[in-house]
Amino acid sequence: MKEYDLICIGTGSAMAVVEAMISENPKAKIAVIDKDKPGGICLTRGCIPSKLLLYPAELVRTIEKARTFGIDSETKNVDFKAVMERMRNIIYKDINKIRQGLSESKHLDYYSEAAEFVAPYTLKVGKKIIKAKMIILGTGSKPLIPPVKGLNETGYLTSDTILEISKLAKS
């Protein structure tokens, strides 16, 4: 069993605590665990992807408003697939940088797999057992699917699945 001063589950906003601890005590033993893509929900399927998609939409709106300034312009086509690929490429670059930084860090051990409590202050990560007196649960959130009759048959998109589409929906 490996013992740590701090175990952090999640690589989003909880990493601020990890960074502060490293800054205060560079010799602290720290484990960071994330079964998903590192970077947290804001980077992987929240704030950042939505902002990257808003910018092209704002450009289209600006082009359409150009007529009010006497500029004859129009948007003939929006390559939705290219817009989505651009967003994904930017995000995956950041995810890969974070993963590399975590994997190569001399200040922490990075576990890219699921964790489960097996005893107080004790986690099983893969086949390893680790322990700490301080454990941060920064595990993010998931979309809530309301119990609407017929919703599953109709089909729906969530804030997670919308980022995976490559063809623009009709409505």
Language-model-detected regions and their locations in the chain:
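Glycine-rich flavin
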Residues: 2-3, 13-14, 20, 24-28, ...
